[in-house]
Regions:
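Short, flexible loop/turn elements at secondary-structure junctions
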Residues: 90, 106-108, 134-139, 201, ...
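Generic beta-sheet signal
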Residues: 133-135, 156-158, 222, 230
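Short, surface-exposed basic-aromatic patches at helix termini and helix-loop junctions that form
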Residues: 117-124, 218-224
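A general structural motif
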Residues: 97-99, 127-129, 192, 224-227
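Short, basic/glycine-rich phosphate-binding loops at helix/coil junctions
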Residues: 70, 151-166, 258
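Membrane-anchoring hydrophobic helices of lipid-metabolizing enzymes
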Residues: 1-101, 106-121, 127-128, 138-145, ...
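Non-catalytic C-terminal accessory region of glycerolipid acyltransferases
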Residues: 2-29, 165-315
Length: 315
């Protein structure tokens, strides 16, 4: 995207996501976007452009932008195939109007976008209060910042074992930024947000789940918070790792049973590794076999996690 945008330039920049689509479809999308951006008014457009220029400058919370969110829904209606849906909606309903931490597998930069759209389509209040924990890469370009604006985000440093972009920061600076981000996350939970955490810490290149990071238990300190596991499929093809364009695919979000964070922590004796492995097993339980990865049925050293999953997450 160009650094300075007028309404026409924004529409043209957005359609670069759609390279490879037929000309008629792109023209229809271009017309719909131009109409809706104009209808939103100059104030909404100016606010969006300012956000594109400034978001990500601090380890802080960035709210959703209404116009960006609407644009994403317009695109989703034309990109997500008809079979795209949410399964286990009764579990989403059980988490309504509660502080909740959603733990998901991580396949692409479009995961949070698809989850927001699918929650919106089933009328869940979680869509409107979704706030994703986001690493620095999410803010590294205008295109990625635009994609982040249809939900709230909290910028956080990546785990030191995975980080590349934060290499210029000292360990002390990373720790300070992480503490600040966690404090902000707790504030957003108290304000009623639904936190979305990709606890693998990075996107999976094999599509299979990677080991959950034990440090993600820091988001579970709120006494009455729920844990809601979800497994996403399809986004690995929608916006592949290394790709720059969106592809028309079927995406499915499969939700598991929500559990009180307090109960899991008590049952696990506050063992951070066991807590996160149990959540990993809960995510794997709703995913197809090829996506279970480190938490598949054949993996060893997960007996305690499987026992807790059976006790707490299974109906």
């Amino acid at each position: 995207m160009p650094e300075r945008l007028d309404q026409h330039a924004l529409v043209e920049a957005i359609t670069t996501f759609l390279a490879g689509r037929d000309a008629q479809t792109i023209d229809e999308i271009r017309t719909a976007l131009a109409r809706d951006i104009a209808a939103a008014g100059q104030g909404a457009f100016t606010a969006l452009v300012e956000r594109l220029a400034t978001d990500g400058g601090d380890w802080s919370y960035y709210p959703p932008d209404p116009l960006a969110r609407h644009i994403h829904h317009v695109l989703a209606d034309r990109i997500l195939q008809p079979g795209s849906t949410s399964l286990g909606v009764e579990h989403v309903t059980a988490a309504a109007h509660r502080p909740v931490v959603i733990f998901s597998n991580h396949l692409s930069y479009s995961d949070a976008n698809c989850l927001e759209v699918l929650l919106y389509r089933v009328g869940s209040d979680l869509a409107g209060r979704l706030t994703a924990i986001a690493g620095p890469k999410v803010y590294s370009s205008l295109k990625r910042r635009f994609s982040s604006l249809c939900f709230g985000t909290i910028k956080t440093p990546q785990s030191s074992s995975l980080s590349s972009e934060d290499a210029v920061m000292s360990p002390r600076e990373v720790a300070r930024a992480a503490r600040q981000s966690i404090e902000v996350a707790h504030q957003r939970l108290q304000a009623g947000d639904a936190l979305l955490v990709f606890a693998e810490g990075t996107r999976s290149r094999s599509f299979g789940l990677q080991p959950m990071l034990a440090g993600a238990t820091r988001y579970l300190d709120m006494p009455d918070a729920l844990i809601l596991p979800v497994g996403i499929t399809g986004t690995e093809a929608l916006f592949p790792v290394g790709g720059e364009t969106l592809h028309s695919v079927e995406t499915i979000a499969r939700f598991g049973r929500p559990v009180e964070a307090r109960v899991l922590r008590e049952r696990a004796g506050d063992d951070r590794r066991l807590i996160m492995d149990t959540i990993g097993v809960a995510i794997a339980a709703v995913l197809p076999p090829d996506f279970k990865g480190a938490y598949g049925n054949g993996q060893v050293n997960l007996d305690d996690a499987r026992r807790l999953h059976h006790l707490l997450f299974e109906d």
